[in-house]
C-alpha cells in the first residue's frame, strides 16, 4: 500500500519546523503508520544532496548577482524533480510516509503571487517536476505578516526572507488562495503550540479514517 505524503506550508516564521517535529514524534509513538514502515522528514529546497547545492544558489545572500525570477523558478523546479525522483516517490512506493517542509504550494505562492510570474507556466513546470505526485494533505500554518516579522527579528534572513513587506504580503495572499483547495487545511499558527498540534493530529486521524 502506498504511503502518505504530508506537506507543511506557510510564510517564514509560521512554525513549520516546530510542528513537523511534534507531528513526527507523535506518529512514531502511535500505530497509525503500518508496522515495518517508516517516516521520512524532508524539505524543499534542499531535500537531496543535489538539492542542497541548489538551495545555496537560491538563498545565499553572499552571491553578488541574484538569479532572476525565471532562473529562480527553474532552479526550484529542478530541486523538486530531483526530490520527487530520489526521495518522495521511492519512499511512498515502499509504503513509507513522507513529511515535507514545503512543496508546490510554496512555488505558487512565492514565485506566482510574490514574483508575479505566470501561474499557468508555474503549474506546467510543476507537472513535469512532480510527475503526478501530490500531497495527501497540506497544512497551511497561517500567521499575520507582522507576526512573521516579529518572530524572525533575531535571526539572519536568507535572500528570500530579505524581500520587503509588500512581497511577503503577496505571498501570504497566495497561500490564502491556495488553501481553498479541499486537500489543504488552514490552521491559525498564532494559537498555542498545543492547540496547533492537536488540530493537526485530528486532521491526520481523519485522513487515515477516510483512506
Swiss-Prot record:
Reactions catalysed: dTMP + ATP = dTDP + ADP
Annotated ATP binding sites: 10-17
GO MF terms held by the record: ATP binding; dTMP kinase activity
GO cellular component, one term: cytosol
Residues in coiled coil: none
EC number annotated for this UniProt entry: 2.7.4.9
One GO BP annotation of this record: dTTP biosynthetic process
Pfam hit, one: Thymidylate_kin
Keywords annotated in UniProt: ATP-binding, Kinase, Nucleotide biosynthesis, Nucleotide-binding, Transferase
InterPro entries in alphabetical order: P-loop_NTPase, Thymidylate_kin-like_dom, Thymidylate_kin_CS, Thymidylate_kinase
SUPFAM superfamilies per the UniProt record, alphabetical: P-loop containing nucleoside triphosphate hydrolases
Membership in a protein family: Belongs to the thymidylate kinase family.
Matches recorded under NCBIfam families: DTMP_kinase
Task of the protein: Phosphorylation of dTMP to form dTDP in both de novo and salvage pathways of dTTP synthesis.
Full protein name: Thymidylate kinase
